[in-house]
């Protein structure tokens, strides 16, 4: 019995020392500083904003980073902090703002929040006028359209995994498929564009860009990339590629390396699901997957300058087909053509601003 009492007393004494120690350590896990907002923060491009933060008086050597770069430091911060952020120094898009520092005991802490820089442009609302209706092959799951001179090229996908993906020369006036090259059933064809004497075709999940000779359609080489492949276009110098998100990657056509990335935003939100792309008079026209809208994008900033309502095309042209997809611009005649996946009709359209 005495042994039991001694053991109980020892445990009690140890507990009287250990419990406060654990409680103290637990209390110290709370960061000595925090931002003055809990959810994502959205600011407009061009604004200079003051982001609030506060400390409990125990923080020191606090560093603020934005997009991975240091923007402000506080050696002995006050309890109320004001973090200055000039949005003009950054591209529009999503960023992380981080607060790093230590408490009086030297314990390191980090606080992270998300900040989005929105466009300062309210998109205009444009519409489409149907100028002419042309036949389109209903078996073509259109993923990309592009002109080289007067020759129309089409890239298709393969939703049934039967090896139907291809790149083909198409007769604009009849819709007939001429010379073509097919992909095996393991590869799902996506957007196409033409630069010089080469055709670039993306694949959806294979992480491959296929490069063909424009005249012979001979496969010349393949480039690797890490994302999904959706749409692609060119300004005659570089390639612009979408991956189904709000991001557009600017790529070097010689090696497919990323030159830079832009994010596509309106003055209110990001525009995800960017699909087929076409470069038209200095701007990128992008189908927005599962919608009847086409985004008109500044390729330098990612700002959406206009949203085109193509509902009239969908209502007339879809038939038993699927979504609107496919934009081709004929530069010499300044004419634009649009269609959709498995659509029986190709439309020559005029943009009404």
Regions found by a protein language model. Give the residues of each.
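Short loop/turn segments that connect beta-strands within beta-propeller blades
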Residues: 170-175, 213-217, 253-256, 298-302, ...
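A short helix->beta-strand "capping" segment at the edge of beta-propeller domains
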Residues: 118-139, 172-176
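Beta-strand-rich domains and repeat architectures in extracellular enzymes and scaffolds
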Residues: 131-167, 180-193
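Short, compositionally biased P/S/T/A/G/V-rich stretches that sit at domain boundaries
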Residues: 4-5, 15-44, 57
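Surface-exposed, short loops/turns at beta-strand junctions within beta-sandwich domains
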Residues: 86-94
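Conserved beta-strand positions in repeat-built beta-propeller and related beta-rich domains
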Residues: 153-161, 201-206, 241-246, 286-290, ...
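A short beta-strand motif characteristic of beta-propeller blades
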Residues: 129-135, 176-182, 217-223, 260-269, ...
């Amino acid at each position: 019995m005495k042994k039991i009492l001694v053991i109980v007393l020892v445990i009690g004494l140890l507990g009287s020392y250990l419990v406060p120690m654990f409680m103290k350590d637990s209390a110290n896990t709370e960061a000595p500083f925090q931002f003055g907002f809990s959810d994502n923060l959205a600011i407009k491009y061009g604004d200079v904003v003051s982001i609030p933060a506060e400390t409990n008086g125990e923080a020191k050597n606090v560093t603020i980073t934005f997009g991975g770069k240091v923007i402000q430091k506080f050696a002995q911060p006050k309890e109320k902090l004001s973090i200055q952020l000039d949005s003009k120094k950054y591209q529009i898009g999503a960023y992380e703002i981080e607060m790093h520092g230590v408490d009086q005991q030297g314990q390191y802490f980090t606080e992270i929040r998300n900040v989005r820089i929105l466009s300062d442009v309210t998109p205009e609302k444009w519409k489409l006028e149907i100028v002419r209706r042309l036949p389109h092959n209903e078996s073509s799951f259109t993923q990309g359209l592009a002109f080289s001179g007067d020759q129309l090229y089409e890239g298709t996908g393969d939703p049934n995994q039967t090896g139907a993906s291809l790149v083909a020369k198409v007769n604009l006036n009849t819709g007939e498929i001429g010379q073509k090259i097919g992909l095996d059933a393991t590869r799902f064809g996506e957007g196409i564009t033409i630069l010089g004497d080469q055709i670039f075709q993306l694949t959806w999940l294979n992480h491959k860009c296929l490069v063909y000779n424009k005249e012979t359609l001979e496969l010349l080489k393949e480039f690797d990339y890490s994302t999904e492949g959706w749409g692609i276009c060119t300004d005659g110098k570089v390639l612009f590629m979408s991956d189904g998100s709000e991001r557009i990657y600017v790529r070097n056509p010689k090696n497919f390396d990323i030159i830079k990335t832009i994010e596509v935003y309106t003055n209110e939100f990001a525009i995800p699901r960017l699909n087929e792309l076409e470069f038209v008079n200095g701007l990128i026209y992008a189908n927005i997957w599962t919608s009847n809208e086409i985004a008109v994008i500044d390729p330098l900033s990612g700002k959406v300058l206009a949203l085109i309502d193509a509902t009239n095309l969908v209502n007339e042209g879809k038939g038993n087909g699927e979504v609107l997809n496919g934009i081709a611009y004929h530069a010499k005649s300044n004419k634009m053509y649009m269609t959709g996946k498995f659509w029986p009709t190709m439309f020559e359209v005029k943009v009404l601003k």
